[in-house]
């Protein structure tokens, strides 16, 4: 199973808990200790940076969490391994370890300095969500109206050059349109759903989805109740199925993956543990989804994308 987004690593939601072992904290939804033993798991661990952290403060915030990520990679090395690409992930799985990818949620970590793209790539960052909800040096999130800045466009080009995946989750519609003019390689939406089924601006329009399919991009289904249904009343995996089928109908059978948003959002009871998330597979099969397509959503689509786009 491959999950393209969680907020488990950073301590923003659990301030002052006194537990630096964020990856195996019993107070968190996602823990190394509660991942199903019979499932090979790969996880994108995002360093979420609040919008108010800018410049040197954003760099310091990232550095604190980056150091803690690698400290935990060493402490829990019998259960988890840091990964940069598909080969690393497959090696971790062969050793019965969780495959951990370091990512960033909010391009403010660049602090407006294009040379930091290379620095972050060297530090093992594999994806950067260009914006969070508000504005940063790269552009605007879904609560604002501006698109990508000139620096944002330059950053996209540099990320592609350095092998860091460009993540458009949180980017507003204007910014998405700007990105299409700049991006030369497949990009990702690590945790976004279909706006046709849930009208929140964080979700992708049908035109966006079609364009991402055309460009061989990757999209992770988000479990947040308010991104699954307008009323937020999610009581079964039927809403995951509905979004899955909508993506399939738009040609996305090879583009759809999972992006839980564990420890960063309000989850429905049916998806509030890793074991319950793993049950998505059986549910899709029970609703008539083929084994090939269910495997694609759970891991194969992301695995193939990594093989082609992560070096």
For each feature predicted by the language model, list its residue ranges.
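Extended, charged catalytic domains and RNA/DNA-binding interfaces, predominantly
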Residues: 1-222, 226-228, 241, 245-248, ...
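A short, acidic, flexible beta-alpha connecting loop/helix-capping segment that sits on the rim
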Residues: 48-50, 264, 299-304
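Second-shell loop/turn segments in exported
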Residues: 56-57, 230-233, 266-271
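Short alpha-helical scaffold segments that flank and stabilize functional sites
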Residues: 68, 246, 250, 297, ...
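Short acidic/histidine-rich active-site segments
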Residues: 223, 251-274
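Mid-to-C-terminal alpha-helical segments outside catalytic/metal-binding sites
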Residues: 272-311
């Amino acid at each position: 199973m491959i999950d393209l987004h969680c907020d488990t690593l950073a301590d923003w939601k659990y301030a002052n808990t006194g537990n630096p072992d964020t990856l195996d904290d019993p107070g968190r939804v996602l823990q190394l200790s509660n991942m199903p033993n019979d499932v090979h798991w790969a996880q994108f661990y995002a360093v979420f940076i609040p919008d108010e952290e800018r410049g040197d403060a954003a760099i310091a915030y990232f550095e604190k969490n980056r150091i803690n990520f690698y400290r935990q990679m060493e402490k829990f090395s019998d259960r988890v391994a840091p990964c940069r690409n598909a080969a690393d992930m497959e090696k971790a799985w062969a050793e019965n370890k969780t495959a951990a990818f370091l990512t960033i949620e909010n391009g403010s970590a660049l602090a407006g300095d294009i040379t930091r793209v290379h620095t972050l790539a060297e530090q093992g960052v594999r994806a950067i969500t260009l914006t969070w909800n508000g504005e940063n040096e790269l552009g605007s999130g879904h609560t604002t109206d501006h698109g990508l800045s000139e620096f944002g466009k330059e950053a996209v080009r540099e990320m592609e050059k350095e092998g860091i995946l460009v993540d458009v989750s949180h980017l507003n519609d204007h910014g998405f349109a700007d990105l299409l003019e700049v991006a030369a390689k497949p990009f990702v939406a690590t945790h976004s759903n279909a706006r046709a089924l849930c009208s929140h601006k964080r979700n992708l329009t049908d035109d966006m989805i079609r364009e991402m399919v055309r460009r061989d991009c990757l999209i992770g289904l988000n479990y947040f109740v308010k991104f699954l249904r307008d009323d937020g009343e999610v009581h079964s995996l039927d809403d995951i199925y509905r979004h899955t089928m909508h993506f399939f109908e738009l040609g996305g059978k090879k583009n759809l993956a999972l992006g839980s948003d564990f420890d960063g959002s309000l989850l429905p009871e049916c998806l509030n543990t890793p074991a319950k998330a793993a049950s998505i597979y059986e549910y899709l099969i029970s609703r008539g989804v083929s084994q090939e397509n269910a495997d694609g959503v759970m891991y194969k689509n992301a695995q193939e994308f990594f093989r082609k786009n992560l070096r």
